[in-house]
Amino acid sequence: MIVRIWHGWTTRANADAYEHLLHEEIFVGIRNREIEGFRGIQLLRRRLADGVEFVTIMTFDSLEAVRDFAGADYEQAVVPPKARALLARFDERSAHYEVVI
């Protein structure tokens, strides 16, 4: 199993709108793609002194399933324009880990 982890940061003013966009539109769109080997997605949120950090954790059966989601350069972050508009900054690349236990 492969876990894909990505970080994005918003201002406090944009945090609720960003979370809503993810929950109501972006995550729904990912699920609707019915990618074989996609197992799920989680969203973490943490308030910081200068904004809000979000972490997405996606689970896949294999790197091939990750490629089906993200493309050949599977480490490249997938950040739709609506999300970019609400983010102050974000990781340009996602990290991938093999689950061993």
Stretches found by the model and what they are:
Residues 14-40, 74-82:
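Short amphipathic alpha-helical segments
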Residues 10-13, 100:
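Short polar catalytic/cofactor-binding loops
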